[in-house]
Amino acid sequence: MCKNIFLTVFLALLTGQSYAFTVYKYTDENGVVTYTDKAKAGAQVFVFNDRMVERIENDVKLETRKHAAGETLVLHNQLYAPVEVQLRLENQGNIAGGVKQPVTWVLPPRSEIRLLTLAPADPQQPLQYKAKLTYALGDPRLLPTTDQYPLPWRGGPFRLTQGANGKYSHFTPKGRYALDIAMPEGTPIIAARAGVVVKIENQQTGRGTNPAGNFVRILHDDGTMGVYLHLQRGSVSVTEGQRVDQGSLLARSGNTGNSTGPHLHFVVQRNVGLAVESIPFDFNRPVNSLPNFAVGGE
């Protein structure tokens, strides 16, 4: 027998201080689930942290090449996007001249560079140092050329359930200016701007291990990046390194990762100097807010 399940999610378009905030999950006698910031008898604490986890340490690598004259440090960028890197040498010993300042560089996509060559002050003794590498996706020298974005979906109309500086989850530098739009699972998600697909995740089921769920990250020509999160498993139709046009189908919306209901989490980010942060943007068409939305299914 089919059973209708209704989920009511209270996600007001909140602004104000940027801090984490306690949400209460309450199920009534009819099985209706409500998320609210008001404590109720029988409610459970539900802390929602919608953060994005992208692991790029396997794509940005520091290689040490030893030779008769000393050692050369070679940096590899296997990503389809530039990466800003900073290399510090700590606990230095027996290095001719020493390396007093950190070395900062922007590696082009899919490239490698000989960053430093170190020679020993005493050729009979080994070099001593500890390499500390810091890096961030993107080129901080590029500046955004627009803050107006076409709607990244087909169909609708759909409603905004959480906006910039939202207390439920939009309080970190990476997600402060993100927008959440409630929509049925399976809604076509399209590229808001043309660019190159940098990273995708397509195999996560439910909450999984990544709070972002399934996602697509696209690098735009001005150095900004559009990121589409909580996508339906198996629906991502683009590949890393692929060039896409504005309006190209990317995937279908879902409810994967740290998601309280079916929606698209869309954010625009850029490298602000060894850190990726979200930046303000607007859709070029009005999207009304909806404090409460309900979805039903069988």
Task: Give the ranges of each region predicted by the language model.
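Short, cationic interaction patches enriched in Lys/Arg with P/S/T/G and frequent prolines
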Residues: C2, G16-A119, Q124-Q128
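Bacterial N-terminal signal peptides
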Residues: L7-Q17
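Surface-exposed, glycine-biased beta-strand/turn segments
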Residues: V103-A212
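Acidic, glycine-rich catalytic/binding loops that coordinate metals and/or anionic ligands
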Residues: T145-A164, H170, K174, E185, ...
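Active-site region of chymotrypsin-like
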Residues: R176, G213-E240
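Active-site loop architecture of trypsin-fold serine endopeptidases
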Residues: Q204-A212, S253-H265
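Short hydrophobic beta/alpha edge segments that flank linear recognition/processing sites
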Residues: F215-V216, V244-G257
